[in-house]
Amino acid sequence: MKRAFIFACLTGLRFSDIQKLKWSEMQQSTELGHYIRFVQQKTKGSETLPISDEAYNLLGEKGKPTDPVFPDLIYSDSRNADLYRWMIKAGIEKHITFHCARHTYATLQLTLGTDIFTVSKLLGHRHLKTTQIYANVIDEKKTVAANKINIGL
């Protein structure tokens, strides 16, 4: 679960897409580096998602093409409890679900300067409006940051 959650933070993939991910969908080319070619569970859209070397290396030893990349990944209350305990150990008190990894990816991409159109495509969103939700989070952070500096005038 931990490895899959970190992979989601590094790729923005939904739980359902990570759960069904097969080794045959993991690709590499000189042009794109590591990438995943898959059909999204939610939208049924065909996607090509570039991933970082760090995300790829997290996967460990490559299995057979038909093998799942995360063979023991199931959605259950006990798995969510595992995730909760892991967060508590890390000092994170906020309620975290697996979907938070996707939010983390989007927010980090925007915070690090990736334009919203690219983030939208990386997430496989059909409409830019969907991605705008994450941009609003960044706008709130900018407002908070701007108000941190106060020289007492």
Question: Over which residues does each language-model region extend?
Answer:
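Exposed loop/turn and edge beta-strand positions of beta-sandwich/beta-sheet ligand-binding modules
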Residues: 1, 32, 45, 64, ...
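Basic, Lys/Arg- and aromatic-enriched nucleic-acid-binding interface segment
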Residues: 1-15, 19, 32-33, 65
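Short basic/aromatic active-site micro-motif
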Residues: 1-2, 76-77, 93-113
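C-terminal catalytic core of tyrosine-transesterase DNA break-rejoin enzymes
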Residues: 6, 10, 16-17, 102-126, ...
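Conserved tyrosine-mediated DNA breakage-rejoining catalytic core shared by Y-recombinases
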Residues: 11, 20-58
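Catalytic-site neighborhood detector that most strongly recognizes the C-terminal catalytic loop/helix
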Residues: 40-44, 123-148
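C-terminal catalytic core of Y-nucleophile DNA break-rejoin enzymes
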Residues: 40-85
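C-terminal secondary-structure termini that scaffold catalytic or DNA-interacting sites
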Residues: 150-153
